[in-house]
A protein has these predicted regions:
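N-terminal, positively charged/glycine-rich alpha-helical extensions of SAM-dependent methyltransferases
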Residues: 1-27
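Class I SAM-dependent methyltransferase Rossmann-like catalytic core
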Residues: 24-39
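Conserved alpha-helix/loop element of class I SAM-dependent methyltransferases that forms part
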Residues: 37-54
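Conserved class I S-adenosyl-L-methionine
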Residues: 55-64
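Class I SAM-dependent methyltransferase SAM/SAH-binding core
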Residues: 65-111
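A short acidic, Gly/Pro-enriched loop at the edge of an enzyme's catalytic core
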Residues: 109-120
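A short beta-strand submotif of the Rossmann-like class I SAM-dependent methyltransferase core
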Residues: 123-126
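A short, conserved alpha-helix within the catalytic core of class I
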Residues: 130-134
């Protein structure tokens, strides 16, 4: 799986908020945990290899800082669309996806994408990011 190094000059999303007011996954990113992989890297790698990504139209929910987006793009999908609700993170992933795809600033529940526009949908850490209201 491809790796992606983060520029230290780019502020993380919600970096301006106190820890108690920032979403948990962005607090973890401040501490150096920039990728949420429930089940670990081995499970993520296993699942992505079996998803038949080369030549597919891929949508990824909550790509965060774009580490998995870079890995997906590295195997040659026909297209890639990230759906990220944080505008700073969406901008980062949009830059990573340029040339192959894009990242839209939207909620996974209302992406704005046409029905049946993806062959593969990736939601690597979606459930781990849901609050009590989910």
């Amino acid at each position: 799986m491809a790796t992606h190094s983060e520029s230290p000059t780019k502020a993380l999303p919600f970096a301006d908020r106190p820890v108690e007011k920032a979403p948990g996954h962005w607090v973890l990113a401040r501490a150096g945990k920039t990728v949420l992989r429930p089940g670990g890297l081995a499970l993520s790698t296993w699942a992505l290899k079996r998803a038949v990504l080369p030549g597919a139209d891929v949508v990824e929910f909550a790509p965060g800082l774009g580490v998995t987006a870079a890995a997906i793009i590295g195997v040659g999908p026909a297209s890639y669309v990230g759906v990220e609700r944080d505008p700073n993170a969406a901008t980062r992933v949009d830059a990573i996806a340029s040339g192959v795809g894009r990242c839209v600033n939207a909620d996974a529940a209302e992406t704005g994408l046409p029905d049946e526009s993806a062959d593969v949908v990736v939601g690597e850490a979606m459930l781990s990011m849901q609050g009590e209201k989910a």
